């Protein structure tokens, strides 16, 4: 899904919303009973894009939708759901809005707010998962893909206090180092807060 984001934007289409949700994020919403999924989760599916178009010219909107459909077929796209009424739109948006709540209900977590050029979203996501495997933590990732923004929710789950309070800082620094290396920033969409101040040297 991340690979399709840059392609969509580079073809002159500017969705009003372009959201990324990895499969585990959607599973959390379902398993924590925060939303009834308006689609079936396929075993081979790895992630989802929520694409919203806006405008007053119906013909132009249909043309853009068809163009997007054609573009995403290059990326092993599965079933495409078209939400053409308010009820269906709200059902899909509820899944996206419920991810943070579902994560919070499951475990103590740390949310790292990252942003990179859209073309590097795939490398960022792959890097986050590799760092997670190295430091033995699970992450739930989602975000505003159209802006290159990725929320990385790191779950405490089975980590010891030492791993959570000490070792994880090394992992988070590696995530932010990767962001900067990929041409991004550690400030994401929310700026640099108290928690991220210790990593501010990476953004200089």
Outline where the language-model segments fall.
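Noncatalytic alpha-helical scaffold of FAD-dependent oxidoreductases
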Residues: 1-204
